């Protein structure tokens, strides 16, 4: 039995050494190309963003998305119960603070939370950008809107020209967001 264990250990060691023989520069080059493609400013065929709607904020005031055209918009569809959303929100707070004066606006649209849940959530996370109520709005949740009901968070990076440059579904990489924002400002 001892010889069998030693043989198995030898085979595993040989396999490990062979797997390290893959040229690391080649693997690194592939990783770098993938990251560059992911973080480029806009997709090849950007589509116009639908900014022609008005949502209520946590205080019940109207917020007209069309009034933000001409800015770089980070439009984030999220929910208070969504763990990946809670990871990204502090990044968005940082982006709003850092890039807001340069023409960025972050807009958070809660897809299934009542207005009463937004204010305490915003205070807890020190949100410095508009939090809007999207609950019950099929025009933004459905396929004719932003498909915000399918996968959260769902974040759109929209250029000054009103075109959707990138769409992120699920937890994304902070650096990708930041690179895209910087390239559009």
Where are these regions (language model features)?
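Thiol/disulfide oxidoreductase modules built on the thioredoxin-like
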Residues: 123-128, 134-182
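N-terminal targeting signals for export/organelle localization
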Residues: 1-56
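Structural microenvironment flanking redox-active thiols in thiol-disulfide oxidoreductases
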Residues: 86-126, 136-143
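Conserved hydrophobic/aromatic "anchor" residues
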Residues: 53, 68, 77-78, 121, ...
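A short beta-strand-turn-helix
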Residues: 52-73, 96-99, 143
């Amino acid at each position: 039995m001892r010889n069998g264990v030693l043989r198995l250990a030898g085979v595993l060691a040989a396999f490990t050494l062979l797997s390290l023989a893959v040229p690391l520069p080649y693997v690194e080059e592939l990783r770098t190309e993938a990251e560059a493609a992911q973080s480029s400013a806009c997709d090849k065929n950007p589509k116009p963003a639908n900014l022609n709607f008005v949502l209520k904020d946590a205080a019940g005031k109207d917020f007209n998305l069309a009034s933000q055209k001409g800015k770089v918009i980070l439009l984030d569809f999220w929910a208070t119960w969504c763990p990946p959303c809670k990871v990204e929100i502090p990044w968005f707070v940082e982006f709003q603070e850092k890039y807001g004066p340069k023409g960025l606006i972050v807009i958070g649209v809660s897809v299934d939370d009542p207005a009463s849940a937004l204010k305490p959530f915003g205070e807890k996370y020190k949100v410095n950008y508009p939090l809007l109520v999207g609950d019950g709005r099929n025009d933004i949740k459905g396929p004719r809107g932003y498909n915000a009901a399918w996968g959260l968070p769902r974040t759109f990076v929209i250029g000054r020209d009103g075109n959707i440059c990138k769409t992120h579904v699920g937890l994304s990489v902070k650096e990708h967001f930041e690179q895209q924002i910087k390239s559009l400002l």
